[in-house]
């Protein structure tokens, strides 16, 4: 996958938040509106579809008792949000949010469907691998949880799905708040789960048995050399776009480990440094016609965790990134 074939990226800021807002995770809705979790303020926000004009104004939805982390849509307008007390009690929950009859301005009522037990430490990214199965990264327990959802939308159950050395964080290292396993995404065409491990600077994958939905083998190294946070994957092109958070870039890597062996780090955005991409945390493809693989939306924390060169954090943002072929 030579770097000269990588696309160019056009960045447009579509929404802004105050400084010191750690935009953590997102879910694109069918109309291209966005749900955004804010880790340090424990909040959930709504971003209107950026169609008629940009920027748009974010709409506050609710506050949780713990940090708001991963969010995933399991069926149209039904979302599951995980929350965790990351630093003290490690109390962690899964909430169900039904937006089928919701419209902006109405209140919402997330329902707790699961309280996690030991060895939970800090829930992070999440993804759907079957119609009723969610995988959730636990970035401080060095593992991935499997959550089975009941068909009737009631209480859920959880158990450890996979624990591996590649998922570990370093509580005694120079950045003890740096997560281990962080973002998780499922490639439906190949039945691989891909995940980032931020502390170890790894991008990994593990095959999933399509019948049992359990790991089918050991995790496999895909790429390394960057502090990847989360990512979105383009299965048609066979690539992933990784957000590097503290390193302020979006990097493109192949989903095939063999194609990364002689491939140096390639940043499609953020090199050279740009004020529009300070602290990118996650990304997701737009859901409009023809947007998959071409138009994605990314969150930034504005330097909340790692300030830009002058030491002053900027407003957190939602950025639209349009990928176009290099000439």
Residue spans for each PLM region:
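Short loop/turn segments immediately following beta-strands, especially the blade-tip
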Residues: 47-52, 97-105, 147-155, 205-214, ...
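Asp-box/WD-like beta-propeller blade repeats and closely related beta-sheet repeat scaffolds
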Residues: 8-10, 88-133, 137, 141-143, ...
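Residue position within the beta-strands of beta-propeller blades
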Residues: 35-37, 80-83, 136-137, 195, ...
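Blade-level signature of beta-propeller repeat domains, shared across WD40, Kelch, NHL, RCC1
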Residues: 284-327
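A short beta-strand motif characteristic of beta-propeller blades
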Residues: 9-17, 53-62, 109-116, 158-175, ...
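Beta-rich, blade/repeat-based domains predominating
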Residues: 17-31, 63-88, 115-133, 165-192, ...
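Short glycine/acidic-enriched loop and turn motifs that connect beta-strands
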Residues: 41-43, 85-89, 141-143, 200-202, ...
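Loop/turn-rich, solvent-exposed surfaces of beta-rich toroidal or solenoidal domains
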Residues: 194, 200, 221-267
